[in-house]
Amino acid sequence: MSVISMKQLLEAGVHFGHQTRRWNPKMKRYIFTERNGIYIIDLQKTVKKVEEAFKVMRDIAAEGGDILFVGTKKQAQEAIKEEATRAGMYFVNQRWLGGTLTNFQTIQKRIKRLKDIERMQEDGTFEVLPKKEVVQLKKELERLEKFLGGIKDMKGLPSALFVVDPRKERIAVAEARKLHIPIIGIVDTNCDPDEIDHVIPANDDAIRAVKLLTSKMADAILEAKQGEETVTA
């Protein structure tokens, strides 16, 4: 059975690319036609690429690998958080902090600080501290949780990155490439596909399109995990 149908892709508006003047010629092989000044993505290729990406995600998860979901644009934030959480994986859906991968030790120090404040809140320390100090600590906790909450339990570097809009997430992409971490990405007609190991040509601006494709990647991880449970049962 196929992972995704043409009907699902059409209904979610996955085929709508960017305006023809805002395009990357390297995406030409994934473009079907041009309509009213907008490029239309070849959905037959998208179906094939979703299936390839699904297999990659499933194989990584089956080997016990962690996948970091990245999407900080408004249209992606909710889907990235929901689907990564559903799959038991990590995510960045606010601002990508430079060095999240290439300077992971420093990021871990910030995560330790986040967990320390959380512990203080839970063990009653807040109750004995001056009110002013508690207010400051709560603000710090909120900020740390916002940017690092999705990776606070990530023990080491991920085995792969799943990215929505590599153009927007160029720092994350550059860091992953530097560390030879494979990247699976939703790539629109204005992006450079050469930077992505496993390209899913698709509309990265429609909430429904992003949600549909991200949920399929989460399904791949869950399929691998269910397979493990069956083996151990």
UniProtKB/Swiss-Prot annotation:
GO molecular function, one term: structural constituent of ribosome
Pfam families with a match to the protein in the record: Ribosomal_S2
CDD domains (UniProt xref): RPS2 (cd01425)
GO annotation terms (biological process): translation
Keywords: Ribonucleoprotein, Ribosomal protein
Annotated InterPro entries: Ribosomal_uS2, Ribosomal_uS2_bac/mit/plastid, Ribosomal_uS2_CS, Ribosomal_uS2_flav_dom_sf
PROSITE patterns, alphabetized: RIBOSOMAL_S2_1, RIBOSOMAL_S2_2
GO cellular component, one term: cytosolic small ribosomal subunit
Endpoints of the signal sequence: none
NCBIfam families according to UniProt: rpsB_bact
The family this protein is said to belong to: Belongs to the universal ribosomal protein uS2 family.
Name of the molecule in the record: Small ribosomal subunit protein uS2
Species of the source: Bacillus anthracis
Name of the gene this protein is made from: rpsB
